[in-house]
Amino acid sequence: MDKLIIKGGKKLTGDVSVSGSKNAALPVFISTILAPGLNEIRNVPFLRDINTTIKVLESLGAVVEGNGNIVKIDTTHVNDVEATYDLVKTMRASVLVLGPLLARHGRARVSLPGGCAIGARPINLHLKGLAALGADIRLEHGYVEAKAKKLKGARINFDIATVGGTEQLMMAAALAKGETILENAAREPEIIDLADILNRMGARIDGAGTDTIRIIGVKELAPVVHDVMPDRIEAGTFMVAAAITGGDIKIHNMKLEHLDALVFKLQDAGVEIINRDNVVRVKGPRRPRAINIKTRPYPGFPTDMQAQFMALMCVADGASVISENIFENRFMHVSELLRFGADITIEGNTATVKGVKKLSGAPVMATDLRASASLILAGLAADNTTEISRIYHLDRGYDSIEKKLAGLGADIKRVKE
């Protein structure tokens, strides 16, 4: 098992390029089930979750070949309709194969999902939506079993905005008979990216990126070439890395408009952000100001940046209040940040962070994907040496982050435990 060793206290400088988005790539890969033939996906990040998705697709009959950041997926012979527990248990997004398999073959059997242990993230909204499209849904021995002779369009109003549920039903409705309206749909940029590939396959989807999405079903979809959007959470993590080290970096291949809420809060904290010719320059202050945040669905402050922003607030001037409104149990990084000398108290879904002048390096343990990033950020800012174990979480969502940070001047290396 690997661990990271960080010698902190170095200001980050230089240029870094953002990889393709994990959260966009996973549904994009799965959407190829709907378009039998050879699909080519470009700007693909090297991640454990990508490898898991490839294994799921191969288990269903797809032939997948990778060459650098380009992955070719031939879904001509996707004839198996079962995604087993062994594959699905490690990654929640695997459940997204349910809708495409149902739309293409009229049946699917998919294990209930796994992934990061950050609270109960039920798929009931996925199942409720598929049932509204005419599917017969049953839960049997930890599996979702779904059948439908032909999915039919429907008006579906989500109880809460759900990214996975919106993606699931967009894909299923693409081949349904008639019109489907998704109300209170998720608005994330990754939804737009999925709609983009589906529309180029021949789907008829309008309104992606708004809370109302209209899908007119078509008889068939055709394979395409698609470039995955840049990873906004990776970009945001680098922005905080510059801020927490008082650094000065330039970030390439990112879309700043995807991070408006984060940019606003960073600027409030005293971080200078300049966007010129699609290159974003981030200059950290001597010491950030304490700022309150509340996580919200997009376009609000992203829950996937909460842990990283908390690390920044650990060294801020003053006290900040951080409210987590998306997921329960998403403060698992707090106990590890305390090992650095941070001053954090939790009450319910709210953390109060009193900034300290300096953190001290410590042995810590990653608990989930974004918590891993927060510990790296704390280690970059801390005096002395930090060791982070269980970094396999990190490999689920960050492509070579330690190499990219080293390229910015960080003293960070991966070693075997």
Curated annotation (Swiss-Prot):
Instruction: Provide the binding site for phosphoenolpyruvate.
Output: K22, N23
Alphabetical list of InterPro entries matching this protein: Enolpyruvate_Tfrase_dom, Enolpyruvate_Tfrase_sf, MurA_subfamily, RNA3'P_cycl/enolpyr_Trfase_a/b, UDP_GlcNAc_COvinyl_MurA
Instruction: Give the positions the UniProt entry annotates as the active site.
Output: C116
Keywords carried by this UniProt record: Cell cycle, Cell division, Cell shape, Cell wall biogenesis/degradation, Cytoplasm, Peptidoglycan synthesis, Pyruvate, Transferase
Catalyzed reactions:
phosphoenolpyruvate + UDP-N-acetyl-alpha-D-glucosamine = UDP-N-acetyl-3-O-(1-carboxyvinyl)-alpha-D-glucosamine + phosphate
Its Enzyme Commission number(s) read 2.5.1.7
For binding UDP-N-acetyl-alpha-D-glucosamine, which residues are annotated in this chain's numbering? R92, D304, I326
| GO CC terms of this entry | cytoplasm
By what name is this protein known? Answer: UDP-N-acetylglucosamine 1-carboxyvinyltransferase
| Organism the protein comes from | Geobacter metallireducens (strain ATCC 53774 / DSM 7210 / GS-15)
